[in-house]
Amino acid sequence: MSKCILVVEDQEDNRQILRDLLGNAGYELTEAENGEEALAAVAKRRPDLILMDIQLPVMDGYAATRRIRTNPDLKSVPIIAVTSYALAGDEDKALAAGCDGYISKPYSPRDLLAKVRTYLA
């Protein structure tokens, strides 16, 4: 059975890139466009990994991550923060919110797949 990745990303173009990259690598994807949709998605199906954009409408990635981490059934699900706002201290902020890893945009497909595979190994 293929691993399920929840992609939380508000930009359709970025979701399409991830859909192509991760789908071609054999992963099953679920998508959410904001933090609230992410919470609804994890309530329906527990993913094996979450790629969480930080800058999101409605509820940002930090708040969504903190909420996900309050659910005992989801504590072990790896969350990788993905952001284009890679400023000093952002990685620490993402880790403090409960993310397990961090990758900044633009990322190389090879680097992203390597990080995903590391957390799903």
Outline where the language-model segments fall:
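Active-site residues of response regulator receiver
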Residues: 53, 83
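Hydrophobic residue at a beta-alpha junction
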Residues: 32-33, 56-59, 68, 89, ...
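Acidic, metal-coordinating helix/loop segments flanking the phosphotransfer/catalytic sites
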Residues: 6, 31-49, 92
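Conserved acidic carboxylate
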Residues: 9
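C-terminal output helix
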Residues: 107-116
